[in-house]
């Protein structure tokens, strides 16, 4: 396994604007691998589809198009072309118990992208599949009136029996997530 580090798109933008400070181009065709970054999104518990025993329906709002807070830009046409890539992907999560003075028994919560190094120095990701985005995920670009942005939205399912993920989503109704973007071409 190669040494990888999870990078948010803000980290990538910060690197190019504050550290690298020169024009550059990236092409997955030349390197043989895409550049993978995380973007922030939301997942909502969706009570509208109760026809799947053992599967909790969820609705995910992932990245938005056009100019981002960090100065990066994802064109609508690029996002539209990438919509099919959401199908048949796992929903990953890392869950841990949080105890507080007010709640010494603890409560299960989602955590961030936990990872550790194995004995060979390779990065091992501690997240595990907690659900699936099926082929019928209804991936589409949707304008969010409140946020005044167009987001990629998909439907998925959380496994009810295999983790505490469904319990957390039913309790919280909405949770923050990050979504992987695979960058095949980039210029700065």
Residue ranges: model-predicted function:
Residues 1-188:
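Signature of dsDNA virion morphogenesis modules
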